[in-house]
Amino acid sequence: MTTPSSPTPTPTPTPLTPNALHRRVSAVGRLTRSLFDQVGAGSRFVVATLRAMRDTQDWLPEFSIHARVLGVESLPIGMFIALFTGIVLALLASYSVGDLVPPYFVGTLVQKTITLELAPVLTGLALAGRVGANIAAELGTMRVTEQIDALETLTFDPMSHLVVPRVLASTLMFPVVVGVAMLVGLLSGWGASLALLDITTPQFLKGVRIFFTDFDVRYGLVKSASFGAAVALIGCRAGLNTQGGAQGVGRSATRAVVISAVMILVLDAFWALVWLTGRTIR
């Protein structure tokens, strides 16, 4: 005859000891303090950059060079991304609405999504990798090879010579790249609608025009300008703070790309809250 087994006792959670609780609170405190330190250091860096903009004779000769490197040479990336984004958007719009709405609404959805969100954000994320890493690696190499120290010894201000032209070029050229990406995205969406969805050109253009406002373009371009400024500032600060030789340069480039991507998403949410809250489509 088998005896019934006794129920398994439920384990009671081990209470935190004072030392363990102190360690956890200390870790949270260190993380919070580090976050505020980084925000404060970043704010001081932005203020120093704005002050250095007064020395136009220092940064103006370098501006066109960086505008070409950071902006013009980034156009193929923006166009390539927008090309396939427009095609995918047209197909998704047709799949989502089906026969529920007139066919011209495909043009409306493509136009609104490209200009308001996808062209600025996707292009910004791609350029964060190219521009942010480029700036951080270039300035980081100059730091570890003591070129920046040599400039300071010769009484040249690194902020006006190195930081300001890159920040201004990135801020002004990001909207140019995004504007071209908007146009390419609309054209590719139109081409996909004609070739794959049996939507005529008048129908697609009707959908583009019916809810189009100049706010759509202004919103996307202003947002992209803020992305460009953030990417350049983060890349410059990461590069100037580089330590540890070649490995330090690699860490600075990686840090610049990651922080820039996060900041782009934060700014995207910020501009949506500021400009889109309570705003209707018309």
Q: What is each of the regions a protein language model found here?
A:
Residues 66-122, 126:
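Active-site cofactor/substrate anionic-group-binding motifs, chiefly glycine-
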Residues 106-149, 177, 234:
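Hydrophobic alpha-helical transmembrane segments of multi-pass membrane transport proteins
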Residues 146, 157-178, 252, 256:
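Start (N-cap) of specific transmembrane helices in multi-pass transporter permeases
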Residues 54-80, 258-261:
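Membrane-interface helix starts
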Residues 139-164, 245-249:
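Short cytoplasmic-facing helical segments at TM-TM junctions of multi-pass membrane proteins
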Residues 14-62, 238-243:
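Short, membrane-interfacial amphipathic segments enriched in basic
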Residues 81-88, 123-128, 164-193, 226, ...:
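Hydrophobic alpha-helical transmembrane segments that constitute the membrane-spanning cores
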Residues 92-116, 182-225, 233-255, 275-282:
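Membrane-interfacial helix-loop-helix connectors in multipass membrane proteins
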